[in-house]
């Protein structure tokens, strides 16, 4: 939910005439998609100028940055003149490149099992790693396990942070429901919009948030349950929570799933969650240089789950 929550907040603040930069990941079709500035995706020339500036700053050390670190610094160069910068974390928490910057506010979407090889093997370990970077003002999704909420409150107390749990202001309820009905939002996008509205309210006021919501257009973000042609959806979800969101969206239907994932993802749990709505899995084979894809593993798991599986051609 990080991407859509961040983009909703970005669009809300844009509606109040703020200059906003939004950094997100992953991208679908073009690297440029990660950089949203002034209501549009950054163009090649803007990225090239930002890259030249980074080379001037880092010199030879630029080669030492990871892919995500490089992209994060590129975003900060691009967004220098913005009123607000919305940074989407990668793995999240103390090991994330976005955490090195001073923050006005943190937003914690629902915390689940992802990046366990970096963040920890238990939900509490993962949550602790993410919540350690809590800013003086923080907002956390109310869709958390109780032990995660308890931990968040404990860390907020120790850091003397102002932590709020997301809820929809009754002042916004009618306009919110009209918007959700107009754009037929699935459950997960409704929840992420609520979170963004609360963040906007914290940053501005309830009156300004209502004004922004009344002007809000459809979510402008690639790959978040995005219908790119009739009955053809693209989604970047890559963990069990995202799979559950897809179950809610396509409940009672059968889909042909064109799929692949990195080998370090919880593929069994993802496909097991999606099983009730899958007719066939088609594996999209893509050459990945840095991280191994799970082609053979998907065949094996699909066989165990009794799901028909073949190569996408």
Model-derived regions, located:
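Beta-strand->loop->alpha-helix junctions that form or flank phosphate-binding loops
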Residues: 23-25, 140-144, 155-173, 185-187, ...
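Nucleotide phosphate-binding/pyrophosphate-handling subdomain across enzymes
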Residues: 84-89, 96-107, 111-115, 125, ...
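Walker A (P-loop) phosphate-binding motif
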Residues: 1-28, 105-107
């Amino acid at each position: 939910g990080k991407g859509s929550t961040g983009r909703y907040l970005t669009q809300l603040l844009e509606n109040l005439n703020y200059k906003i930069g939004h950094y997100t990941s992953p991208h679908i079709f073009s690297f440029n998609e990660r950089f949203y500035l002034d209501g549009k995706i950054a163009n090649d020339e803007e990225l090239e100028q930002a890259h030249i500036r980074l080379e001037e700053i880092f010199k030879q050390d630029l080669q030492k940055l990871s892919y995500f670190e490089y992209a994060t610094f590129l975003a900060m160069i691009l967004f220098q003149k913005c009123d607000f910068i919305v940074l989407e974390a990668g793995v999240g928490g103390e090991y994330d490149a976005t955490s090195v910057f001073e923050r006005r506010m943190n937003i914690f979407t629902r915390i689940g099992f992802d990046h366990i090889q970096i963040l920890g093997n238990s939900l509490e370990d993962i949550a602790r790693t993410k919540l350690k970077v809590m800013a003086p003002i923080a907002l956390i999704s109310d869709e958390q396990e109780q032990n995660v909420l308890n931990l968040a409150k404990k860390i907020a107390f120790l850091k003397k942070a102002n932590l709020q749990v997301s809820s929809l202001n009754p002042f916004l309820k009618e306009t919110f429901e009209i918007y959700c009905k107009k754009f037929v939002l699935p459950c997960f996008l409704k929840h992420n919009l609520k979170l963004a509205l609360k963040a906007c309210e914290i940053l501005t006021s309830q009156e300004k948030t209502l004004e922004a919501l009344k002007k809000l257009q459809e979510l402008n973000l690639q790959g978040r349950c995005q219908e790119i042609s009739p009955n053809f959806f693209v989604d970047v979800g890559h963990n069990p929570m995202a799979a559950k969101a897809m179950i809610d969206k396509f409940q009672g239907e059968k889909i042909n799933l064109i799929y692949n994932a990195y080998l370090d993802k919880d593929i069994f749990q993802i496909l097991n969650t999606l099983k009730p709505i899958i007719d066939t899995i088609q594996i999209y084979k893509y050459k990945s240089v840095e991280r191994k894809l799970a082609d053979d593993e998907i065949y094996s798991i699909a066989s165990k789950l009794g799901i028909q599986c073949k190569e996408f051609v």
